[in-house]
Amino acid sequence: MKVSAALLCLLLTVAAFSTEVLAQPDAINSQVACCYTFNSKKISMQRLMNYRRVTSSKCPKEAVIFKTILGKELCADPKQKWVQDSINYLNKKNQTPKP
């Protein structure tokens, strides 16, 4: 009887601490998109709609995710020149006010 009471006490303690851990900001189910491989071919700038940088410590590599006009997302290496040129192109394109 003492063993089951001690086991129940231990189980309740673990359950109480696990809810506190889950309530922490890092434990929130946030979607972090990670890139494990990079697109090997250069993407035409005219096909690109926007981009976002992946710098999360939860991801193995820093990356840039481009979104195409067809809605596809492609991972690219931010160190490659064509990726940097595409980022500059999209920054200028999105800054230009439309009439």
Swiss-Prot record:
Report the domain of life of the source organism.
Eukaryota
Which cysteine pairs are covalently linked by disulfides here?
A: C34-C59, C35-C75
Q: Which residues form the signal peptide?
A: 1-23
Alphabetical GO CC annotations of the entry are:
extracellular space
Q: PTM details?
A: Processing at the N-terminus can regulate receptor and target cell selectivity. Deletion of the N-terminal residue converts it from an activator of basophil to an eosinophil chemoattractant.
Q: Which residues carry this modification: Pyrrolidone carboxylic acid?
A: Q24
Picking any one GO biological process from the record gives: eosinophil chemotaxis
Query: Which Gene Ontology terms cover its molecular function?
Result: CCR chemokine receptor binding; chemokine activity
SUPFAM superfamilies assigned = Interleukin 8-like chemokines
Q: Where in the cell is it found?
A: Secreted
Instruction: Give start-end ranges for the coiled-coil region(s).
Output: none
Write down the InterPro entries for this protein, in alphabetical order.
Chemokine_b/g/d, Chemokine_CC_CS, Chemokine_IL8-like_dom, Interleukin_8-like_sf
Query: Which purpose does this protein serve, as stated in its record?
Result: Acts as a ligand for C-C chemokine receptor CCR2. Signals through binding and activation of CCR2 and induces a strong chemotactic response and mobilization of intracellular calcium ions. Exhibits a chemotactic activity for monocytes and basophils but not neutrophils or eosinophils. Plays an important role in mediating peripheral nerve injury-induced neuropathic pain. Increases NMDA-mediated synaptic transmission in both dopamine D1 and D2 receptor-containing neurons, which may be caused by MAPK/ERK-dependent phosphorylation of GRIN2B/NMDAR2B.
Q: Give the similarity note.
A: Belongs to the intercrine beta (chemokine CC) family.
| Name of the protein | C-C motif chemokine 2
- Species whose genome carries this gene: Bos taurus (Bovine)
